[in-house]
């Protein structure tokens, strides 16, 4: 298979601009919006107990579209959001994830890590992967890849891909929370099985597994997870 590198942009490449579409808000409206958003996010929780109630797919689409507005290195947008609603595929993902997690908890977790996880009550069982109506797997495109008409490939470097995908994932979580849904960030290790199950291209690496839906009527969260650092411990003003 032939692989060609994209030419590196030079100073002769055309640089153009477009008007900024921005409406400045009155100070009162700005403050009201920021306070409302803060309250919404303060109520965000990582939820493992999902209702089987269907979620309108438009909510997922809007959340992914919002994530797609994230800034990225050289505006390369090196992410793919794989949305899985098929019960059979979700079952395969759960089976593989539980196998990896079972091995992790049995043979690889350190005493310090086990102690850190104890207040959260986590274990190898991942019912949320089949209970949630949708499971969204975020993939990082480690490098750009395009299949050519002659069967060859063209690939190119992606800059700050992991950092860019992390920002997009944060926007996705904020968007689903803003829409009244709950989610969980799950990172089984290793995660190569996810690309295999979904048949993703060879340039993609799983970044996070995010089940999304409505909370179960009897959902609970670890009390430990309610403890968030106060503003004074996370912000330094100069």
Region roles according to the model:
Residues 2-30, 206-238:
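C-terminal helix-cap and adjacent tail motif
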Residues 2, 83-165:
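Glycine/small-residue-rich phosphate/adenosyl-binding loop
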Residues 66-68, 119-124, 194-196, 219:
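Glycine-rich, charged/polar anion/phosphate-binding loops
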Residues 101-110, 198-222:
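A glycine-rich helix N-cap at a beta->alpha junction
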Residues 63-67, 136, 142, 146, ...:
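Small-aliphatic-rich amphipathic alpha-helix that forms the alpha element of a beta-alpha
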Residues 1-62, 103:
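N-terminal accessory segments that position/regulate proteins before the catalytic core
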Residues 75-78, 130-132, 205:
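Short, basic and Ser/Thr-rich N-terminal targeting/leader segments
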Residues 68-75:
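Glycine-rich phosphate/pyrophosphate-binding beta-alpha loops
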